[in-house]
């Protein structure tokens, strides 16, 4: 008697049993590992490698009892677990994992964009002196000169009542003043000097004409 005949006679004694686990407890796609590889290593496609799962499981336990009780729920209701709890797929897990993980490169990009936008806004809000309005409604305060500045300007006026542009720049740098302030001071000082000499000298009218011409040349 061959071994194949003996095996067939042995397994024919037991009826075909159902699956070890009751139907409906586990879905077909329980996890990523079971979904990706339906066959396990060690079980080939040859006739000698196949093994009937139902009959073997039925033979392992006496009285045809299954591994788990034949109840519709695997765990009691107090655990709060049902058949839908085991139906896990790969795509929701990967989506949740990718949403929880933060990308440092994206954060650096957003910070760089915010910094560029702030610099751009500061550049737009920057106001230069030539952009300010020079209307008549602006009230300018009276310029006050220190004693040292007044003394140096008086000494310069004593030698030269009219200044060249180069000399005006030199005095402005020396006294920490602007060219406009030097020019205004000399204009006011010349007007004062004219008033002082008008009453003392009768020939003041003849001196006013060349002075006005020089003032026009200086303003240009």
UniProtKB/Swiss-Prot annotation:
Keyword set includes Cell membrane: no
Compartment(s): Nucleus
GO process terms (BP): anterior/posterior pattern specification; regulation of transcription by RNA polymerase II
Stored Gene3D superfamilies: Homeodomain-like (1.10.10.60)
Main localization category: nucleus
Family recorded in the similarity comment: Belongs to the Antp homeobox family.
Name of the protein described by the UniProt record: Homeobox protein Hox-B7-B
């Amino acid at each position: 008697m061959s071994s194949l005949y003996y095996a067939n006679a042995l397994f024919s004694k037991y009826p075909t049993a159902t699956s070890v686990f009751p139907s409906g407890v586990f879905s077909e796609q329980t996890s990523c590992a079971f979904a990706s590889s339906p066959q396990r290593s060690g079980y080939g496609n040859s006739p000698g490698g196949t093994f009937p799962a139902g009959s073997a499981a039925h033979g392992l336990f006496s009285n045809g009892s299954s591994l788990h009780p034949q109840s519709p729920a695997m765990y009691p209701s107090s655990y709060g677990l049902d058949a839908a709890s085991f139906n896990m797929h790969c795509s929701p897990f990967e989506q949740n994992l990718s949403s929880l993980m933060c990308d440092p490169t994206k954060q650096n990009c957003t910070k760089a964009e915010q910094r560029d936008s702030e610099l751009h806004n500061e550049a737009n809000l920057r106001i230069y002196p030539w952009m300010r309005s020079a209307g008549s409604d602006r009230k300018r305060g009276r310029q006050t000169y220190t004693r040292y500045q007044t003394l140096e300007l008086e000494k310069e006026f004593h030698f030269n009542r009219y200044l060249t542009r180069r000399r005006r720049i030199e005095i402005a740098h020396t006294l920490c003043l602007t060219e406009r302030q030097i020019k205004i001071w000399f204009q006011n000082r010349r007007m004062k000097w004219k008033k002082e000499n008008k009453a003392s000298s009768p020939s003041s009218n003849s001196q006013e004409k060349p002075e006005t011409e020089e003032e026009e040349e200086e303003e240009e």
